[in-house]
Amino acid sequence: MKASISIDEKKDFIRWFLNKHQMKTREAMWVLNYIAGHDQIVKYVHFVDNLEGCARGLSLSAHGVESEPFLFFKGSIMTTDPEKAFHDIRLNWDEELYVELHFEEAMTSPEYALVREDNPFAAVKLAEEEKEMADALIYQSVHQFSREKLLQQIDEALDTRDEATFHKLVRILQQMDTEKE
């Protein structure tokens, strides 16, 4: 997650985007211009790669990509009517609005990268290999911690000259080391 993106950076991006890309619907351009013209709204706008899990979102497409031209949703209500979206954005200016933009070379655009944020609601999907690596790391950490604790107890047994405890702990340590191999 990157540091907070300033209002000016978001406004500059919207202006750049509208100058560089032609929207599939002119209403999408109007909505973006309206947002850019109101700092109090821009403050609550977040540009994300997908709208999964977001309570309120706007998906807009420029020419050159295969995506719906205009989608707005709030909760379980979804609409392609820009006027309803505009009305909601205007009235609920202080609610978080997640915006997903579809345009050519979006993922390689440095301008978009500057304002793009991680979707805080998107489920994190780990590949099987990543899960196995995480499990191995956890196992190794627990094993290392247990071994260090056991070595401390062995040192204490030596310091107190407790031969029975010392031998018992050494056997546990040897068994632990054998199991790890």
Swiss-Prot record:
Belongs to the UPF0302 family. It comes from Listeria innocua serovar 6a (strain ATCC BAA-680 / CLIP 11262). The lineage of its organism: Bacteria, Bacillati, Bacillota, Bacilli, Bacillales. It comes from the Bacteria. Pfam families: IDEAL (PF08858), UPF0302 (PF08864). HAMAP family: UPF0302. This is UPF0302 protein lin2035.
